[in-house]
From Swiss-Prot:
It is a single-pass type I membrane protein. Residues 1-35 are lumenal. It catalyses: a 1-acyl-sn-glycero-3-phosphocholine + H2O = sn-glycerol 3-phosphocholine + a fatty acid + H(+). Keywords: Developmental protein, Endoplasmic reticulum, Hydrolase, Lipid degradation, Lipid metabolism, Membrane, Neurogenesis, Phosphoprotein, Transmembrane, Transmembrane helix. Residues 57-1494 are cytoplasmic. A motif (GXSXG) lies at residues 975-979. It is found in: Endoplasmic reticulum membrane. It comes from Drosophila pseudoobscura pseudoobscura. PANTHER family: NEUROPATHY TARGET ESTERASE SWS (PTHR14226:SF29), NEUROPATHY TARGET ESTERASE/SWISS CHEESE D.MELANOGASTER (PTHR14226). This is Neuropathy target esterase sws. A nucleoside 3',5'-cyclic phosphate 2 binds at residues 474-601. The modification Phosphoserine is found at S443.
Length: 1494
């Protein structure tokens, strides 16, 4: 509200323009100073007189007592006796006089409340209470403010004292290679050596063999890099407990290729002790445990992709610099060039007749890599058009090589007549649009080429034979093992610009070998330092004939990290992923050859970075670095969550921020070379990549583009910090006001009691999250079915953590549904969770159970949020939330969720899955509480900020209606002054009709002038006492707390006790709304009961920001109009929040809102003032004012100056909000309405509605409304984005190769258990049926929440199903009822049958292999073998066909068995249901007969 406008009430306002009011204000303004001094003098004289009187009375009484005591002592001495009688003790006096007073009060109260008597006495007492304010209010219940435990802000200092330091350091260093069992670790320890180095001694030098892992036990080692000019540059400093090793050199040593240091040197800075572990020790271990070797290779490849590539590509902008771009020649050690294919196949096809052409082709390709093989002139025109679409190289560092792929394609692809072989089904897909790719800048120049005769026909069998031979060499297999890969090799012919595989696709992962032509490898422009990502792909490198690609994705088991396209006409040979894994079972060593192929392709830069980059694993509570330590490195969070805590000089700790997956930690301190300003610790188990400062300097010198990336990153970070200036300096700032990122990757769901419907709740939340992005729901059953029943054992720690990390990487958020007991899965969920949602029933008891306390003990540092569920009934509203929060001081935030009827329906687990299989196919309701919770978890919340402006705040109601019609959800609400009132109404009701009705009634009460006159008081602090104003707000809200509102709400007030603004997110609603409306001069500040601080209108500092009405009243405490409101918590005086921030959008942004709509209805000051010079005369102003013939001047008067001074902070905050990118600032045209024009409520509301409707329609046409009402994707998400768990399974190569116990997938029969026969909720988590993919398909429909009609439809469907089943039972024989024990026995027999079926299947496969080998031997003896493989195509086809038929028969038998079991279980369940229905009907009939008899 505006003080100046209140002092300038126009004559048009009929309620305040009376003569009596004007005379009263004029008299008070002139006489207030004299009256104040007079009363002060009278008060001082009165105090002096009273003090003098009391002093002399006290002195006289003391003299009298002294005389009496002296007389008694004289008498006692004379008589020699004791004259003391019975003593009247003080306690007895208090009891005596207390009883007398109570008897009198009882008589008085009896007279007052007797019928028709004591009326005058009651009136006098009521008048006295009103004047003297003797009324006593019961203070409301408030949230107990409990400091978080010490573990929440402190690191864990517990050390591993039982482990020797050298063993501990070694264990931590080799952890990068994966998990080792204890016997293997002890065998590795036997090979360790201790090296003692003095300062300046070399640990290793250039040309030394790179065959060891070095671990620093004490001292410091400096690792240098040597440049070409002979200069050296420090790469990193290795301290105690750290290691020096290279993962790429480790693969070289295992592959048998000796590696030497070429540019890296290590020297001791001081006296040091280093542990040396030879890599040959691993070879000895791997001979006995091949599964360990394969697992180590897989871990190294995963670390290479997640650490090296993530750091260098996403944060330093290096893409093509990571791969060597060279062409392999004929003399290469692995594979052969295209000339070899030409000469070999030509000789085999035509013998000596075509030797001349073959030799010419061979000499043409071997002589120069840039010379094309001659081709017929007729084909030039054909290829010239295709070559125009060949992609150019956007990176000038990569040579644009013109290869002979097209001519070789002519030799292989075009036979007599020019027909191409297209007999194979296409694996690839042609791109529909190549608009994101740049076309070639220049055409190919046609050179003079000699004519060549006709090319002879080529047999595709020989082409495949050549491909098999080349792939065999690439995989490191001997010649006699060619038959192993022959059945799996496929050959395809590619047109130009054909996509073989796309980035992020896990379905078509293959090992590609280029026979002719060229493949181009691209990667998306994923720059972590940019806000808007480019959709263009970056060219990484070319794959030339004789080279292989795809080994990295094959070894990691993850999706492809690149997009591969054909650059021109090409022929490729490939082996699919499943085939590679089958080959690995027979020849595990191909894992090393694939890994070696990946390593050979990397550039020297990657090898140098491999020495500097470190992979760090931090357990929960461990510190990454501490405050005031030196900053020599930065860190990238790969997985987990980190918390930054600052320690103030007084010892108090405060949260500065939290970091999630993909965040960069400590970059500013490292670049500015300052010490660490905070302590960063792990909230949960986390993986990080460490980038030392020396590596940054080395890369900056070689690639200046890195500097640009760092500047861009720092600029965006500083810009974001400026726009999200924190408000933690205020005493009332909540924990959420800290700049903590409210975006979580993993969420654990924990039920408070067994009757909580956790599975339906998880499904509903999963349904809403699917509209935002890819999400995954994990349960204990699903983990066991995917990874085995023993997956939670300690020996399977690596498999479980790797699988969970893979799922988290592929989804924006992962839901961990915990068990109802403290099981290993529940403990794992606590270790993996970024936030824990504690789910309870709002209408049940708030007591804390033992299980919940154990959860708090397991996750001390993890943020916990309370979710209370309420049924969808007309009378259900949140209540008693304070009791829930006080019983759980560890909860940082709470959510009220209104649930549809289907969540509380008591159904079996099978029926719940069946119900949500249909629900998940529909669109979620974006206005539901589940969608609001989903947006909060993913950091996409939408906030609404309502500013102050007096009666102009009626426009907020119209804007709310327009927002609702525009389809914009509201997740958070904040308000100041009148905005606090309107926002609180919306959060309480969420119905625009009810909100409008209550706001209109309150506005009518504000127009009753006689009530305002009765509220006038002597204007020492304010003009009004605020009693009637408090009454109107209290009647509007009642005794409601802010915690009981449906939508998260806050109001902002001005604390004049602490001289700052305060944010209120809990407490009495009406009081803080009242204090936010306490405009200075009109209403006294509200005294905060918490600390006694005086609170004024929050608009004085920020005009856009317990029992509910108290804080609403505090937010409306206009200074001078109403007295400041005293906070019932601390006693601070609160005034209107408009003095500090009239539109607190910045506060809303700090509380977690990503998109904000700010509505400002405040008055605008006139800035067009008159320049009157250096001095100003009041007489001159008076002359200008009264002279009608002079030009008017605009000079602010005293009240105007005071008002402008009060709103200085508010105006500054408002300008920052207008210029921010996260806020949509809206100001309706309501300037013509005065601050106190409450009688024009409907008119102002209509103005706001019409303006808001037109405004949002304009935003929709401009395409700017999507970020508010279209938070889910318009297009159906692709299969890769919403893939099911079966599509993204963790590939454990060790399990595949070494034939470890296999796990079972999701079978339909596994979804049926004995729990289905029970009534009520089955809290044990489970999964959907087999077709999980269709539940993640985009929804089709309008709403998630089912209406009554939809619920009836569901019930009708269920009734139809029941009738169909009854009809089936009527025609068929009803199976007998089965007990639970029988079901358990049948389940056990099913498992045995499945085991027997698998044994038979393996026996059939072994028999087929034996028959195949016998057939091969027979064919070899007859001399009818083809090529070097000893294998006929017909035999291969026959063998494969027999295997396929056997598999189909097995699958049919298995499916038939499962269908029978499912029918039996369903039949038993239906029979039980029928029996229960019959019993229920019999009981009801018996009751009716009894009633009739009575």
């Amino acid at each position: 509200m505006d003080v100046l406008e209140l002092l300038r009430v126009s004559g048009s306002n009929m309620y305040y323009s009376t003569f009596l009011a004007d005379a009263w204000c004029y008299y008070i303004s002139n006489q207030i100073t004299m009256t104040m001094y007079l009363y002060c003098a009278l008060g001082v004289l009165s105090m002096l007189f009273i003090g003098w009187f009391v002093y002399f009375k006290r002195l006289a009484r003391l003299r009298l007592r002294h005389e009496i005591a002296r007389s008694l002592s004289a008498v006692t001495m004379a008589s020699g006796g004791d004259l003391r009688g019975p003593r009247f003790r003080k306690r007895d006096k208090m009891l005596f006089y207390g009883r007398r007073m109570l008897r009198k009060m009882k008589n008085v109260s009896g007279q007052m409340y007797s019928s028709g008597k004591g009326y005058k006495r009651r009136a006098v007492i009521r008048f006295a209470r009103r004047i003297l304010q003797l009324r006593r209010e019961n203070m409301p219940l408030e949230v107990r403010t409990v400091e978080p435990p010490a573990e929440y802000l402190e690191e864990t200092m517990e050390g591993s004292d039982r482990v020797p330091p050298d063993a501990l350091y070694m264990l931590q260093s080799i952890r990068i290679f994966g998990h080792f069992e204890k016997p293997i670790f002890l065998r590795l320890c036997k090979h360790t050596q201790l090296l003692e180095l003095m300062g300046g001694d070399y640990l290793f030098k250039i040309t030394d063999p790179d065959d060891s892992v070095y671990i620093v036990q004490s001292g410091m080692i400096n690792v240098y890099i040597s440049n070409a000019d002979g200069s050296t540059l420090s790469l990193k400093t290795v301290r105690k407990g750290e290691s020096v090793t290279s993962l790429l050199s480790f693969i070289d040593v295992l592959s048998g290729n000796p590696s030497y240091y070429k540019t890296v040197t290590a020297k001791a800075i001081e006296k040091s002790v280093v542990i040396r572990l030879p890599m040959a020790a691993f070879q000895e271990v791997f001979k006995d445990s091949p599964d360990v070797m394969i697992r180590v290779i897989q871990v190294i490849m995963i670390r290479l992709q997640r650490v090296l590539f993530t750091a260098l590509r996403n944060y330093l902008g290096l893409n093509a610099e990571l791969v060597q771009n060279h062409m392999r020649f004929k003399g290469s050690s692995q594979g052969a060039g295209p000339s070899v294919y030409c000469s070999q196949t030509t000789r085999q096809a035509t013998g000596s007749a075509s030797a001349t052409a073959s030799a010419a082709a061979a000499s043409g390709t071997a002589g120069s890599t840039h010379t094309a093989v001659p081709r017929p002139a007729s084909s030039l025109s054909r290829y010239s058009q295709d070559e125009q679409h060949t992609l150019s190289d956007p990176n000038p560092g990569i040579p644009n090589l013109e290869l002979s792929g097209d001519s070789v394609n002519t030799l292989f692809g075009e036979v007599n007549g020019g027909a191409r072989l297209n007999s194979y089904p296409p694996l690839y897909h042609q791109r529909e649009s190549d608009g994101n790719l740049s076309t070639r800048r220049g055409s190919i120049t046609q050179q003079e080429q000699p004519e060549v005769g006709p090319v002879p026909s080529i047999d595709m069998r020989l082409v495949k034979s050549s491909a098999v031979d080349s792939l065999r060499k690439e995989l490191g297999l001997p010649e006699q093992d060619a038959h192993i890969i022959d059945p799996f090799v496929e050959v395809r012919e590619m047109e130009p610009n054909v996509t073989l595989i796309t980035e992020g696709n896990a379905d078509d992962v293959c090992v590609w070998f280029v026979m002719t032509g060229t493949l181009a490898v691209y990667q998306g422009n994923a720059d972590a330092t940019r806000i808007k990502q480019d959709k263009t792909d970056l060219l990484i490198h070319y794959v030339h004939p004789g080279e292989i690609v795809g080994g990295l994705a094959m070894l990691t088991g993850e999706a492809s990290a690149y997009t591969i396209r054909s650059r021109n006409h090409s022929r490729v040979a490939f082996i699919r992923r499943a085939a590679i894994y089958q080959i690995m079972r027979q020849r595990p060593r191909i894992v090393l050859d694939l890994g070696n192929g990946v390593v050979r392709r990397l550039s020297p830069l990657v090898r140098q970075c491999d020495y500097a980059l470190d992979w760090i694993f931090l357990e929960s509570g461990r510190a990454l670095y501490r405050q005031d330590e030196s900053s020599d490195s930065t860190y990238i969070v790969l997985s987990g969550r980190m918390r930054s805590v600052i320690t103030h000089p007084g010892g108090k700790k405060e949260i500065v921020g939290e970091y999630g997956k993909g965040d960069l930690v400590g970059i500013v301190e490292m670049i500015t070379e300052t010490s660490r300003t905070t302590t960063v610790m792990a909230v949960r188990d986390s993986e990080l990549a460490k980038l030392p400062e020396g590596l940054f300097n080395a890369i900056k010198l070689r690639y200046p583009i890195v500097v640009t990336k760092l500047i861009s990153f720092l600029s965006h970070r500083f810009l974001g910090s400026m726009q999200t200036r924190t408000t933690t300096g205020a005493p009332g700032a909540p924990v959420e006001a800290n700049p903590v990122t409210h975006k979580y990757s993993t969420v654990a769901l924990v039920p408070i009691t067994d009757d909580v419907p956790l599975t339906p709740f998880t499904y509903e939340l999963y349904h809403s999250l699917c509209a935002i992005g890819p999400v995954l729901r994990l349960t204990s059953d699903l983990a066991r079915k995917q990874l085995g029943m023993n997956i939670f054992d300690a020996s399977n720690e690596y498999r479980l953590t790797s699988w969970l990390a893979q799922q988290e990487d592929r989804n924006i958020i992962t839901l961990y549904q915990c068990d109802n007991a403290l099981s290993p899965w529940t403990q794992r969920c606590m270790r993996q969770a970024d936030v824990v949602l504690i789910v309870g029933l709002g209408d049940h008891s708030h007591l804390v159970g033992k299980f919940e306390r154990e959860i708090d003990r397991l996750a001390l540092r993890t943020q916990k949020e309370l979710v209370l569920l309420y049924p969808e009934t007309a009378s259900s509203k949140p209540a008693n939330t304070l009791s829930w929060l006080n019983a759980r001081p560890w909860v940082t935030k709470h959510h009220h969720v209104l649930c549809v009827k289907r969540i509380f329906t008591r159904k079996s687990q099978y029926r719940i899955n069946d119900l949500y299989s249909r629900v998940l196919l529909s669109e979620p309701n974006m206005h539901s509480d589940f969608s609001r919770l989903a947006r909060w978890l993913t950091g996409n919340s939408i906030g609404l900020v309502l500013g102050g402006g007096g009666a102009r705040g009626a426009a907020h109601i119209g804007m709310l209606k327009a927002i609702q019609e525009a389809g914009i959800p509201i997740d958070m609400v904040g308000g100041v002054s009148i905005g606090a009132l309107m926002g609180a109404l919306w959060c309480s009701e969420r119905n625009i009709t009810t909100v409008t009705q209550k706001a209109r009634e309150w506005s009518k009460k504000m127009t009753k002038w006689f009530l305002q006159l009765l509220d006038l008081t002597y204007p020492i602090t304010s003009m009004f006492s605020g009693r009637e104003f408090n009454k109107t707000i209290h009647e509007t809200f009642g005794d409601v707390n802010i915690e009981d509102l449906w939508i998260p709400y806050f109001t902002l007030t001005t604390d004049i006790t602490a001289s700052c603004h305060r944010i209120h997110t809990n407490g009495s609603l009406w009081r803080y709304v009242r204090s936010s409306m306490s405009l200075s001069g009109y209403m006294p500040p509200l005294c905060d009961p918490k600390d006694g601080h005086l609170l004024l209108d929050g608009g004085y500092v920020n005009n856009l920001p317990g029992h509910l009405w108290r804080y609403c009243r505090a937010s409306m405490s206009i200074a001078g109009v109403f007295p400041p409101f005293c906070d019932y918590r601390d006693g601070h005086l609160l005034l209107d929040g408009c003095y500090t921030n009239n539109v607190p959008a910045d506060v809303m942004h700090n509380l977690g809102a990503a998109h904000i709509i700010a509505i400002d209805v405040g008055s605008q000051d006139d800035t067009d003032l008159t320049n009157y010079g250096d001095d100003l005369s009041g007489w001159w102003l008076l002359y200008k004012k009264w002279n009608p013939f002079t030009a008017p001047v605009k000079v602010p008067d005293l009240p105007d100056i005071q008002s402008r001074l009060a709103y200085v902070s508010c105006v500054r905050q408002l300008e920052e909000v207008k210029n921010s990118d996260y806020c949509e600032y809206i100001r309706p045209p309501i300037d013509k309405y005065k601050t106190l024009a409450f009688g024009s409520f409907d008119e102002i509301r209509d103005v706001g509605y019409v303006f808001g409707k037109n405004y949002f329609e304009g935003m929709a046409k401009a395409g700017r409304l999507g970020r508010f009402n279209q938070w889910f994707s318009k297009e159906p998400p692709k299969r890769g984005n919403h893939a099911s768990l079966n599509e993204y399974t963790f590939i454990d190569l060790a399990q595949i190769v070494c034939r470890l116990p296999e796990t079972y997938g999701l079978n339909p029969s596994d979804l049926f258990s004995e729990d289905e026969d029970c009534d009520g909720y089955i809290s044990e988590p489970t999964t959907l049926n087999t077709d999980v993919r269709r539940y993640q398909v985009p929804r089709g429909g309008n709403s998630l929440s089912l209406s009554e009609t939809e619920m009836d439809m569901d019930s009708d469907v269920e009734m139809d199903l029941k009738m169909e089943r009854k009809m089936d039972k009527a025609t068929q024989s009803t199976p007998p009822l089965q007990s639970k024990a029988q079901i358990l026995r049948r389940k056990h027999s099913k498992e045995e049958a499945r085991h027997e079926w698998e044994i038979k299947r393996e026996q059939k496969q072994e028999l087929a292999r034996e028959q195949e080998l016998e057939r091969e031997r027979e064919l070899s003896q007859k001399g009818t073998t083809a090529g070097a493989t000893g294998y006929t195509p017909n035999a291969v086809i026959a063998t494969q066909t027999s295997l396929i038929f056997m598999d189909e028969e097995d699958e049919m038998d298995k499916k038939k068995t499962k269908d029978n079991d499912r029918d039996e279980v369903r039949g038993s369940a239906e029979d039980k249901g029928k029996e229960k229905e019959e019993d229920k009907e019999n009981r009801s009939n018996t009751n009716n007969e009894t009633k009739n008899y009575l």
